[in-house]
Amino acid sequence: MALVASVRVPARVLLRAGARLPGAALGRTERAAGGGDGARRFGSQRVLVEPDAGAGVAVMKFKNPPVNSLSLEFLTELVISLEKLENDKSFRGVILTSDRPGVFSAGLDLTEMCGRSPAHYAGYWKAVQELWLRLYQSNLVLVSAINGACPAGGCLVALTCDYRILADNPRYCIGLNETQLGIIAPFWLKDTLENTIGHRAAERALQLGLLFPPAEALQVGIVDQVVPEEQVQSTALSAIAQWMAIPDHARQLTKAMMRKATASRLVTQRDADVQNFVSFISKDSIQKSLQMYLERLKEEKG
């Protein structure tokens, strides 16, 4: 049960599970261009946060080249960045977007799931679970400004948000295309998609591994707005202002009430979900399929 993309993902050597993450500490700061109230950028190797404390909003930019694949390091840095914003009471909303041209996130990093130990697979899947839970249950207003392709694990990130805005570019598709690679989305992501677009539409999308171009994405309801590419960020700022106009306590309690059942299903089954993932991804047939896919990507790149 993995969330991977059909876009090109580099086959690169990554740190082992539990290894020290270079650049994971979020101690570097610099003054943000145009940031109000003396705001300063902070970030890590793969995540840049541009805060505007005066407005109560931060923009979190993904910058894990070349395609923002969700490696173990990137997952960790995303959670740390979100936690830092949640602990700062001056921030009430976050816009999630990409610093990489043409791609929001290509999904989970296949090299984390191929040729590794069961312990590594378990650690990686726990990190995926943690990111989803932290985003899905966040008290902050989360708006995704989708300025690039958003398949598989990228769609996971977008679906956790309160509001989704997609750039009107036919190359920027969004959806959960796992079945096209012979794998499936986990139950908790299935639930999230079903909550968003309804049972029948989700059933069709998941079985066929559909990726929706902008017009279809808006029609099915997987995104809330489609706007010209140059207007994505400004539209996100306008949208987040609308959400932040609601008193926090009322909005947060309502959000928690609406999402509690879906989140609780994973919280109560986290260990079993990890075991199922490790068992599935360790199968010889799945490993061979992933290895063939990675080799094909190498050949295309070369």
Swiss-Prot record:
GO BP field: fatty acid beta-oxidation
GO CC terms in record: mitochondrial matrix; mitochondrion
Localization in the cell: Mitochondrion matrix
Chain positions recorded as substrate binding sites: 106-110, 153, 177
Class in the EC hierarchy, top level: isomerase
Tissue: Expressed in liver (at protein level).
Catalytic reaction(s) noted: a (3Z)-enoyl-CoA = a 4-saturated (2E)-enoyl-CoA; a (3E)-enoyl-CoA = a 4-saturated (2E)-enoyl-CoA; (3Z)-octenoyl-CoA = (2E)-octenoyl-CoA; (2E)-tetradecenoyl-CoA = (3Z)-tetradecenoyl-CoA
Modification type N6-acetyllysine: residues: 61, 89, 283
InterPro entries the record matches: ClpP/crotonase-like_dom_sf, Enoyl-CoA_hyd/isom_CS, Enoyl-CoA_hydra/iso
Transit peptide as recorded in UniProt: 1-41
Annotated SUPFAM superfamilies: ClpP/crotonase
Residues the record lists as N6-succinyllysine modifications: 61, 84, 283, 288
Keywords: Acetylation, Fatty acid metabolism, Isomerase, Lipid metabolism, Mitochondrion, Transit peptide
UniProt pathway: Lipid metabolism; fatty acid beta-oxidation
Annotated EC: 5.3.3.8
Function: Key enzyme of fatty acid beta-oxidation. Able to isomerize both 3-cis (3Z) and 3-trans (3E) double bonds into the 2-trans (2E) form in a range of enoyl-CoA species, with a preference for (3Z)-enoyl-CoAs over (3E)-enoyl-CoAs. The catalytic efficiency of this enzyme is not affected by the fatty acyl chain length.
Subunit annotation: Homotrimer.
UniProt family annotation: Belongs to the enoyl-CoA hydratase/isomerase family.
Protein name, as recorded: Enoyl-CoA delta isomerase 1, mitochondrial
Species in which this protein is naturally found: Homo sapiens (Human)
Gene: ECI1
